[in-house]
Amino acid sequence: MLLKQTKIVASISDRRCDVDFIKQLFEAGMNVVRMNTAHASREGFEALIANVRAVSNRIAILMDTKGPEVRTTANAEPIPYKIGEKVKIVGNPDLETTRECIAVSYPNFVSDLNIGGTILIDDGDLELEVIDKTDGYLLCEVKNDATLGSRKSVNVPGVRINLPSLTEKDRNNILYAIEKDIDFIAHSFVRNRQDVLDIREILDAHNSDIKIIAKIENQEGVDNIDEILEVADGVMVARGDLGIEVPQERIPGIQRVLIRKCILAKKPGIVATQMLHTMINNPRPTRAEVTDIANAIYYRTDALMLSGETAYGKYPVEAVKTMTKVAAQAEKDKLEENDIRIPLDENSNDVTAFLAKQAVKATSKLKIRAIITDSYSGRTARNLAAFRGKYPVLAICYKEKTMRHLALSYGVEAIYMPELANGQQYYFAALRRLLKEGRLQPSDMVGYLSSGKAGTKTSFLEINVVEDALKHAEETVLPNNNRYL
């Protein structure tokens, strides 16, 4: 069974992606590998993808896009600034940044900003205030001592930057993700539903089933979360840029609201950024970091993400092991009365959601060891995950891709099994496999949600003891198109 029910996403660099390293992370509790397109070459991606697939077909791969971001241009060497100094800013991606003039990648940067605005560079390390504006440049005052490196992030809190959702590099990377059959695309700086639909249009044109995770990194994304969740397949609370774009004291509350909305939408939510930041250089986390992980789980997140901790940190395997141990304990300690109650829409006639809720409720009344579902698209398993049962969901998947698409869903252990039998015989084959692998015992009671046929909607819930289900398999017939139970 699962080491923990909360899933772990680990960022991996092409500079450290050998098979042994990935295997260690997987065995420590990693479920998804994140590839950052800002920091790797195409050759590096090739090696990373091949090595992940060599370790296990159960590890999902998530690719980041850059999205509508603004960066400074290159500068020959780091530039020191002192508080009170004046510096010009221009929007010219072809101009080199100098001490007197900082150039940024967005041509209309000057026109989008006003006097009195704040500009934060390099995740807020350098703060500037706009004190004058001309047609060609902004004159800014330096608000703190800092050193500026090359191609650093630029954030403008409270200002909408009118950049297109996708860069040309993003489009090329999406086509590459389709070619390599990547599992998830995490799109940066999602502001509204159209930003998601821009990616969906490309995927649909190539008949791709890649799932889209919307990274919420600014106030506009927070404000439009409901419409974003209508079209995205999940959400990442990207606390790094979000903590720059909105006041940092609001981050915990925003995190809680976004997780809740993901659960109500029955789509996975990921909490990211600085979960174990000190473990980049230290073998042990701070107490605050341990509490941060636990609180995200108490909020009922599906997944947690490690960034620099595993991409370039000194203790990557230890970081995953630490997160696994903290998650497992937090899952035991969380209070059931704080579970998010998902109302059933009486007008929707959503049989899948109704049966999923009853299956999870049954685990609190009966000694059910696990809930089993056969899964073609993963929808039933995601419904079960949303209700946050105490025991794992064993999703027996007809397709490998579905198995990996469930790698972000809380409490779901997805298992790929080709459709060797029809209808209920697939269920019996799954039970025999689970017994053989030691995941279940003959005396275990299980719940089973299915439609009886791959690709059709869930239509019944059965609760039975494993050995009884198999013993009477050829004797009992349900009124479900005469498929054997």
Regions found by a protein language model. Give the residues of each.
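Non-catalytic helical/linker scaffolds that mediate oligomerization, partner binding
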Residues: 1-485
